[in-house]
């Protein structure tokens, strides 16, 4: 038996909303026959596209087989046959739209960061709980092949006692001149529009650290706006008011130390745009978006510092690939299936808006640390 579930998808005219959420998740789920449920039935998503640009919505609809679309959020929310509201639009507008959807009784699934402020994010979580609707936040990094292999190592005890985690994320985002358009929208570089790499990436680092290694207990951060001006989508030069690089340190539960560099102003000399090294007493691993490599204690070379002679050790040769041993689906699609299944069955969904609140909280405290030039404790949230 097939069951329909209507999904209002706000923000699909943007790059992530279109490519990852609509095309590679919802439409791919439809193409594959829906989401299989424990009772043998199948849940089939039926999206309606929501946005402000009628021309773009019509073009997307036509490209993908005549999908439903609309430009009036109130009208879309008034349809009782569409029971899920998804938001991947501008962060600054998310609270207003999500609260409106909660009031209409819709289940909520949204991109991170869920808000620009912890207080606003908490209002969304509290409202969703009080309304009794299911709610979730996108945490795609947890479902990437490289991270899932790393989680397998942690669960197996490969590292022994984990000592430290070091992450490098970023790439050069073109300024918009020299005939090279920027790979990110201009609002990302305007603080007043909800931009900034701390707000964007520390939400990722929070759930990645919390769910893989241990709860973040304190943070120390500094950041910068390295590129003072850029060229926007219309060819106009504008001032950058948001941070484009951040350098964070985190103390985790279990006496694990982590440090992450996040930058839109760095040129890549590593295997992937994001790489994370984990060091433990028994072994180490380097994980990227898709690959993961390990070096056990017994395979660790014994270098001796001597800058007067050429290095004789090829350090990369001493690392072993972790095999897939499974088929890895698109990370966004995996989490969409989990959320839709949780709505249909009532089963727990751990990646709720409260988890999204924690990401905003860490970003806010990191910004405070940067401005006050000190370590800041990260308190537990009152979710009652």
Annotated model-derived regions:
Residues 68-80:
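Short acidic low-complexity segments
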Residues 160-164, 368-384:
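C-terminal capping/lid region of NAD(P)-dependent oxidoreductase domains
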Residues 88-89, 370:
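Glycine-rich, N-terminal phosphate-binding loop of Rossmann-like dinucleotide-binding domains
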Residues 83-84, 90, 95-142, 157:
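Beta-strand-loop-alpha-helix segment that lines the small-molecule cofactor/substrate pocket
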Residues 141-240, 373:
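Predominantly a Rossmann-like dinucleotide-binding segment in NAD(P)-dependent oxidoreductases
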């Amino acid at each position: 038996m097939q069951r329909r579930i209507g999904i209002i998808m706000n923000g699909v005219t943007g790059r992530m909303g279109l490519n990852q959420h609509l095309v590679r998740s919802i439409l791919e789920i439809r193409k594959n026959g829906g989401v299989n449920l424990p009772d043998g039935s199948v849940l089939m998503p039926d999206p309606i596209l929501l946005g402000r640009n009628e021309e773009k919505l019509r073009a997307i609809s036509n490209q993908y087989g005549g999908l439903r679309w609309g430009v009036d959020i109130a009208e879309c929310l008034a349809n009782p046959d569409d029971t899920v509201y998804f938001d991947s639009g501008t962060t600054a507008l998310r609270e207003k739209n999500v609260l409106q959807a909660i009031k209409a009784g819709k289940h909520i699934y949204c991109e991170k960061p869920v808000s620009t402020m912890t207080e606003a994010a908490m209002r969304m979580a509290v409202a969703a709980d009080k309304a009794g609707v299911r709610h979730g936040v996108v945490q795609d990094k947890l479902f990437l092949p490289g991270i899932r292999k790393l989680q397998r190592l942690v669960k197996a005890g490969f590292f022994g006692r984990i000592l430290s985690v070091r992450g490098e994320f970023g790439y050069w985002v073109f300024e918009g001149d020299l005939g090279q358009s920027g790979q990110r929208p201009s609002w990302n570089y305007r603080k007043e529009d909800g931009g900034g790499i701390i707000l964007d990436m520390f939400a990722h680092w929070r759930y990645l650290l919390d769910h893989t290694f241990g709860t973040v207990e304190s943070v120390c951060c500094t950041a910068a706006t390295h590129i003072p001006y850029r060229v926007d989508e219309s060819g106009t030069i504008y001032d950058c008011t948001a941070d484009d690089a951040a350098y964070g340190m985190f103390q985790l539960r279990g006496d694990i130390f982590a440090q992450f560099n996040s930058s839109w102003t760095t040129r890549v000399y590593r295997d992937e745009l994001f790489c994370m090294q984990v060091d433990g007493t028994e072994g180490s691993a380097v994980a990227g978006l898709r690959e993961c490599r390990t070096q056990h204690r017994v395979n660790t070379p014994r270098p001796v510092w001597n800058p007067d002679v050429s290095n004789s050790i090829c350090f990369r040769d001493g690392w072993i690939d972790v095999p897939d041993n499974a088929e890895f689906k698109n990370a966004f699609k995996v989490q969409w299936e989990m959320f839709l299944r949780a709505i249909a069955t009532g089963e727990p969904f751990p990646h709720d808006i409260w988890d999204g609140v924690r990401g905003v909280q860490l970003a806010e405290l990191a910004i405070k640390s940067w401005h006050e030039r000190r370590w800041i404790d990260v308190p537990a949230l009152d979710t009652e």
